[in-house]
Amino acid sequence: MTLPSGHPKSRLIKKFTALGPYIREGQCEDNRFFFDCLAVCVNVKPAPEKREFWGWWMELEAQEKRFTYRYQFGLFDKEGNWTAVPINETEVVERLEYTLREFHEKLRDLLISMELALEPSDDFNDEPVKLSA
């Protein structure tokens, strides 16, 4: 499948995978890509498969000359589902912001190398983390 930008989807998936453990290929559809990051374990006592994590997820959409994004912070529960919830621990929020900024920078650099822009979705108003200068 070729995306609106003219790039083959399979090649983009490979490039996105090389950015780190973020892309969820099974949740990517058509010209949309899904990334997430399980940044902070809520409680290490349960068995690994039953642990919950604070983290973020990002949806990326391929368009003609750019990719647009929207992201959320929240809880990745033991069933493997994301829920947007407020996070009150300063250290956790700082870690989430750091990992999101790091990923955003790598993603932006990759897209620039392909002569594509990375911009917030037109309807994405909630930008609690400053991602670009």
From Swiss-Prot:
Region Essential for activity, annotated ranges: 99-122
Coiled-coil boundaries: 90-111
Keyword Transcription regulation: yes
Keyword terms of this UniProt record: Activator, Coiled coil, Cytoplasm, Transcription, Transcription regulation
GO biological process: positive regulation of DNA-templated transcription
Subcellular location field: Cytoplasm
GO cellular component terms, A-Z: cytoplasm
Domain of life: Bacteria
Main location: cytoplasm
UniProt family annotation: Belongs to the Crl family.
Record's function text: Binds to the sigma-S subunit of RNA polymerase, activating expression of sigma-S-regulated genes. Stimulates RNA polymerase holoenzyme formation and may bind to several other sigma factors, such as sigma-70 and sigma-32.
Protein's recorded name: Sigma factor-binding protein Crl
Source organism: Salmonella newport (strain SL254)
Gene name as annotated: crl
